[in-house]
């Protein structure tokens, strides 16, 4: 069974959208194997976003991701990585179609891709790496 890592980001937590996001996951038939609400830390964020850690905009990402609690988790199901990415919608909320999580809930100004409600691994390799970073598995 395929697994993926997800984050319900601080903007969604602040707006009380956790239940609505989880409802969509469960209605799709995916199994939430692990889940935890926590304050994300800079050390693991640098590891998670390793390809961005030396970019000039990384401090903005880090500051946002540490601005409040987030929900991290592991879900599983057939084709969960692609399906979850489709459910999330385009990374830029302004490009996200209605019916996707970002299209329905994201309120970031067009072009601001940081507060975009959710994160999901983009490949099996990324999922394994992100699960190890956040859950030690």
Swiss-Prot record:
SMART domains: NDK
Catalysed reactions listed for this entry: a 2'-deoxyribonucleoside 5'-diphosphate + ATP = a 2'-deoxyribonucleoside 5'-triphosphate + ADP; a ribonucleoside 5'-diphosphate + ATP = a ribonucleoside 5'-triphosphate + ADP
Keyword vocabulary terms for this entry: ATP-binding, Cytoplasm, Kinase, Magnesium, Metal-binding, Nucleotide metabolism, Nucleotide-binding, Phosphoprotein, Transferase
Gene Ontology CC annotation, any one: cytoplasm
Domain of life: Bacteria
UniProt cross-references to HAMAP family, sorted A to Z: NDP_kinase
Functional description taken from the UniProt entry: Major role in the synthesis of nucleoside triphosphates other than ATP. The ATP gamma phosphate is transferred to the NDP beta phosphate via a ping-pong mechanism, using a phosphorylated active-site intermediate.
Subunit structure: Homotetramer.
Name assigned to this protein: Nucleoside diphosphate kinase
Organism: Streptococcus thermophilus (strain ATCC BAA-250 / LMG 18311)
């Amino acid at each position: 069974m395929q697994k993926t890592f997800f984050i319900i980001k601080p903007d969604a937590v602040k707006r009380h959208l956790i239940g609505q996001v989880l409802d969509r996951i469960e209605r799709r038939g995916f199994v939430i194997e692990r889940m935890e609400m926590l304050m994300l830390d800079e050390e693991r964020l640098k590891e998670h976003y390793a390809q961005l850690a030396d970019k000039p905009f990384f401090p903005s990402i880090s500051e946002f991701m540490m601005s409040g609690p987030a929900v991290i988790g592991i879900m599983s199901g057939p084709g969960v990585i692609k399906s979850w990415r489709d459910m999330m919608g385009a990374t830029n909320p302004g490009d996200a179609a209605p019916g996707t999580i970002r299209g329905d809930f994201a309120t970031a100004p067009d072009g601001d891709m940081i507060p975009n409600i959710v994160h999901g691994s983009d490949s099996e390799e990324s999922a394994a790496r992100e699960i190890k970073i956040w859950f030690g598995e």
